Amino acid sequence: MIDNKVFCVHGGIPPPWMPGGGFISHLDTLSNDIKNPEDDEPLVWEYLWNDPWFSDFKNSLPPNTKIDDEGFVSNFRRGTGHLFTAKALDKFLNRNRLTHVIRAHEVKQNGFQVQHQNRLLTVFSSSKYCNGSNDSACVLIDNKKLRLLKLDTS
C-alpha cells in the first residue's frame, strides 16, 4: 500500500464473494505462513493469479461463459483464478477508498501497460525475460502523481 491510496499486488483483485468481501483490510487477518494458498487461502490465490480483462478476450470466451454482474469471469487463459473488468476494478477501488492498483505478473513488451481508465498499471521490471525482447519499467510516485519510467537496460 502506498499513501493509503495505491494498492500493489502481484496478480489482481479478488471477486467480492471471496472471504473478506473484497476489502483489503481482510489481508491483515491472514497468516504469513501459507504453504498451499490454492487450498488453504483461496483469497491469496486470487491476489496471486487474477488478471485484467481485455476486450479482445471477448472472442476467446469458452462457450456458455459470461462475465458476471460484479465484472468477473473465470480465467480461461490460465485455468485458475479470475479475469476482472474495469467495472470490477472500479468497485474494488471505491470499496477500499483507493485510486489505483499496481500489479506485475505479466510480461509487457514496453515494460508496462495502463488499463481500465488509467487506474490499473501493470509493471514488469525484468527486461529480456526468458531471453525475450521486452523492456522493463518501474513506477515513481511523487506529490500524489504516478509516473511510469521505462528503464534502459541495453
Q: What are these regions, as identified by a protein language model?
A:
Residues 1-154:
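Feature recognizes metal-dependent phosphohydrolase scaffolds
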